[in-house]
Amino acid sequence: MENYQLVLASTSPFRQQLLEKLAIPFSTLSPNCDETPLEGESPQQLVLRLAESKAQSCQINQPSLVIGSDQVCVINGNIVGKPHNRQNAIAQLTAQSGQSIVFYTGLAVYNSETGETRSCIDEFKVHFRPLTQAQIVRYVDKEQPFYCAGSFKSEGLGIALFEKLEGKDPNTLVGLPLIDLIDLLAQQGMQVLG
């Protein structure tokens, strides 16, 4: 598959940084899809549908493998989105203090030549330390995680919020499960290590 171009259907700088770890040249495109949850759709169904939709929405003129990814954070059965501002971030972290939350990340690789899409879901659990309001405010003011699901950056100071992490790939928390991606690329004929 040397003639296949790798494309990341995302403008997220976090996902781009993760994909760079694989040392494969890639380009990025902004996906064009409606991210509104469907009525009755589970978190798992939502992230899988959106990952596939993002990958398939990119119009490519050459043979490419297009990567789509989507992530939601679930606490007490409710999907928690990005906070977008300081007040919401503080409220989210206050609700998560001493709790366990689950991240579901949908991942899809679309082959623009064959039309085939391979996809999977990765689950990652985060157990928060009991946090004081002062700790939460200090963290939010220092790291400003306004565009991160769950209101934290696990790759930064956010690690101080956690008691325990459970999952097969810590990259999942940042939004791109690389272990699963390596497998999906291999299923499409692209070997990361050659």
UniProtKB/Swiss-Prot annotation:
The keyword Cytoplasm applies. It catalyses: N(7)-methyl-GTP + H2O = N(7)-methyl-GMP + diphosphate + H(+). GO terms for biological process: nucleotide metabolic process. It holds the Pfam family Maf. GO terms for cellular component: cytoplasm. Keywords: Cytoplasm, Hydrolase, Nucleotide metabolism. One of its GO terms (molecular function) is nucleoside triphosphate diphosphatase activity. The record marks F14, Q71, E155 as: Important for substrate specificity. Its EC number is 3.6.1.-. The keyword NAD does not apply. InterPro entries: ITPase-like_fam, Maf-like. It is an enzyme of class 3 (hydrolase). SUPFAM superfamilies: ITPase-like. The active site is at D70. It is found in: Cytoplasm. Its cofactor is a divalent metal cation. Its main location: cytoplasm. Belongs to the Maf family. YceF subfamily. Nucleoside triphosphate pyrophosphatase that hydrolyzes 7-methyl-GTP (m(7)GTP). May have a dual role in cell division arrest and in preventing the incorporation of modified nucleotides into cellular nucleic acids. This is 7-methyl-GTP pyrophosphatase. It comes from Vibrio vulnificus (strain CMCP6).
